[in-house]
Amino acid sequence: METSERLVILTTPSRNDGVRLHIERAVQTHGKNQDLLLKQLPHMETAIETLKGGTGDIVAMSALDWQKYDVQGLSIVGLLSRKEPTWVLVSDDKPEYLEQGALVLCEHELLQRQMKRMRPDLRLERIEETVQRLKAEKDVAELDEEDIWPWVEEQRLQGNLDGFIVPRAIHAGHRMKGRRHTLGLQRDQTESNRERFIPPPLYGFTILVSRQGFPKASVREMLDPSAELAYRLEASLMESIDPKLRPIVGAYIEQRKISTFLKKATEDGDETLLNTLVNPNKKRAVYKSGPRVEMLIETLTSDGTVTAACERIVQPENSQMGLVTLLKEFMDLLSVMTTDHEATKRNIPGMPDSFMEPKPRLMDLSLIHISEPTRPY
């Protein structure tokens, strides 16, 4: 081990977000070349106050915790490599093969809509509804937050549920024996053209936070600049979205090698994607070198029948402008799809008479009532 000043990294017990396991593995890996000490405190509030008080050097937290807690006087040092942000279905069968009318527990409104888009026949419940159906209010009230998901898994094993949908970190953190089926970002051509599931934003990030002025160079080897870029873009995107829409918006931003995009586009025969990767300043079709930043965003109606989605692929140096363009396209699309189309007297040659008739809006987001989850993730 190289001689270096000891750095104390504060953490908490597992909070169903994957941060504890992520930072623990990072300390094990980088602690071979640097003096790192992982210190556990009982609560995130305690860890933050301890850091502010001058004890400890860094607190590891999720992106959602950074938004939730009082972090005045603290700053983000950097991020670890992003963990898989997709959610999983815990069940014996893949989502395509669940029985007709299967009963699935899902707390997140966005994931409920995405599942309805894929399987409109499924019966979807929240935890509160499951507890009431099973008349288990007293039993669940006595459970700690960490025990709620093992209880849900037990209900599945007993046949009271056919499956449940959770962040990947919950399945991994509780070492559940049930099979997990990834609700992935890519459309799966092998699974009946499974629709992709753009996840809720900001999952999978582990942020390292310290007092302002902390020397970033002392932990540079632990940090992933591409994860930091993705986080800042994703957070900026969601800050620009109407708070009423945020619970039903899926967003994902990632920097990847150009070879990854080329392979996927070639496999799918996606000429549009291939053309976006070509250098327009060259007479011959030459692919512009360097990584790309992929940006995805979508929202759905409550029954999952109508989707509004946009995506862009840009070079990292153009990512901020690309984000602005993506957001404008998405909001313009939403405006068109949520507006009633009045009758028009304009007759366009080749268009049927029905073109001039009034049309109801394609999406109705005004009637949506989004209830808060009964338990935080």
Task: List the model feature ranges, each with a label.
Residues 89-104, 118, 122:
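Flexible hinge/capping segments at coil-to-helix
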Residues 59, 103-106, 164:
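Short, hydrophobic beta-strand segments that form beta-sheet elements in well-ordered domains
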